[in-house]
């Protein structure tokens, strides 16, 4: 598969041929289910001319159906382009194909999609991760040059690690959320999934920057990263020792070898510990579900998507539309979020979670005052099997090493570093200071080239 960098040199005719090839390949590889069009026996959606980039089903593209992989949004056609789509088109890219996802981005396996599950291209018995599993599977399976996803608690980095591609989540506010169907507004961030680190920098440069349409957009200077990539920069990297040691043995051993290679390549390694991850999980799921319960209240049968036909009055319209339209995991999170915001529990849960979030952020900032980057696992294990019986809590633990990065609002990237004995991918995660994506991408490029050579 050609890279984004190479495709940007293509003529208009060559790009049209490339899109035809990708469309045919998507039809042949239908069982992977990376694209929603593969479930519906349709050609891949296309908008504008340029280098094709696949788009997660929660990012608005004018004229395309936007469903967040949910029954409740069936038939909703986006009336405008999200800011990232406007930026993509302005930089020579073309939205091409709707990627499958966990319903409303709630999940770690892309098995909660209304359309059906996406398979991991490395092993069809394994999950591709989530919630941007379709975006990762499309890139890893050679069905897309690159894709856009969203990351609320690891939803770009974790599927990238499971499928074996690069997944990059910029700092909160660096990329506009205008036109992204919200899950948790203070945690959501649009990110990129690519074949390599340089492509991640190129695609990030195309979508990043201040946007007056997004009140949470960071109004600070943005300097393009791809032209300034420096693979030779020597960095001080903090290894989170307790997280590396707690990972599965194969993941741990692969990361320890990677750390030795970083040392051998002239990077300074120091060892630090972060808080017990149980605090991250508790704070994250209280804040994320609280915000989700508010954000998803807009899907009521009046304004968007499908309305239940089994209604006699207004109350039945609300109850039946939401009961029929939302999947089990979404209902679970709405209930949890409503509970933690209720008057008797608001102080006990939500306020405490916000205090814990501030504490987690301060801990990261303390480490990054003295170091350029943080190094730790992306996931505790490699991709698990679809038939693995996991409770909701066990599923939530899949994001144990990624959620705190969102709580702190920092940038993070997942880079493939090894394979396990079953040829499943193992990735390392690098984390930077807020808005220091240049250093993050420099470090990731250095790591990638080190592994390849």
UniProtKB/Swiss-Prot annotation:
Enzyme class: ligase
Source taxon at top rank: Bacteria
SUPFAM superfamilies the record matches: Amidase signature (AS) enzymes
A Gene Ontology term for the protein's cellular component: glutamyl-tRNA(Gln) amidotransferase complex
Active-site residue list: 56 (charge relay system), 131 (charge relay system), 155 (acyl-ester intermediate)
E.C. code: 6.3.5.7
Pfam family name, one: Amidase
One GO process term, biological-process aspect: translation
GO molecular function: ATP binding; glutaminyl-tRNA synthase (glutamine-hydrolyzing) activity
Catalysed reaction, written as an equation: L-glutamyl-tRNA(Gln) + L-glutamine + ATP + H2O = L-glutaminyl-tRNA(Gln) + L-glutamate + ADP + phosphate + H(+)
Keywords: ATP-binding, Ligase, Nucleotide-binding, Protein biosynthesis
Subunit structure: Heterotrimer of A, B and C subunits.
General function of this protein: Allows the formation of correctly charged Gln-tRNA(Gln) through the transamidation of misacylated Glu-tRNA(Gln) in organisms which lack glutaminyl-tRNA synthetase. The reaction takes place in the presence of glutamine and ATP through an activated gamma-phospho-Glu-tRNA(Gln).
NCBIfam families found in the cross-reference section: gatA
Family recorded in the similarity comment: Belongs to the amidase family. GatA subfamily.
Protein name as catalogued: Glutamyl-tRNA(Gln) amidotransferase subunit A
Organism: Campylobacter jejuni subsp. jejuni serotype O:6 (strain 81116 / NCTC 11828)
